[in-house]
Amino acid sequence: FNPRVVALSLVVGGIAMLVIEKWRPTPTTEIVDDISARAALGIGLAQVLSLIPGVSRSGATIMGAIALGTSRVAATEFSFFLAIPVMLAATGYELIGSIDLLSAEQLSMVAIGFAVSFGSALIVVKALIGFVSRHTFVPFAWYRIVFGAALLAFYWG
């Protein structure tokens, strides 16, 4: 982890979002069910960018999908569908690794935490999909640029 890399990634990612929003192709895919295998592979490859600190996994996949001609709504939905297996696998792996260390009470607390976070995630994703059905990702792009620039000033200042 290097804060300068994170800061640069925020700025570069924000600029990439602005570029993709400005020059995106007219969407040819309006719903998730119509995303082709080829587009899904391209979106999955965009997800690899999230290995760079400061690059958002959802941001990379959403922008990758939009650049490949997917509507904002379908891109956002697909991005969050992609997250489900990754998050379940990571959670399962961590849980299996520490199952011997957790009491029954702690396991029930983990289950409650999982249920609450899943429910709140559904609410937030629904709100985001409602937002992107009416707006662009430009506000998110500017947020990334401003926040990244502030971090750059702090760490290089």
Describe the residue ranges of each PLM region.
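Multi-pass membrane proteins that catalyze or facilitate reactions on polyprenyl-/lipid-phosphate substrates
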Residues: 1-157
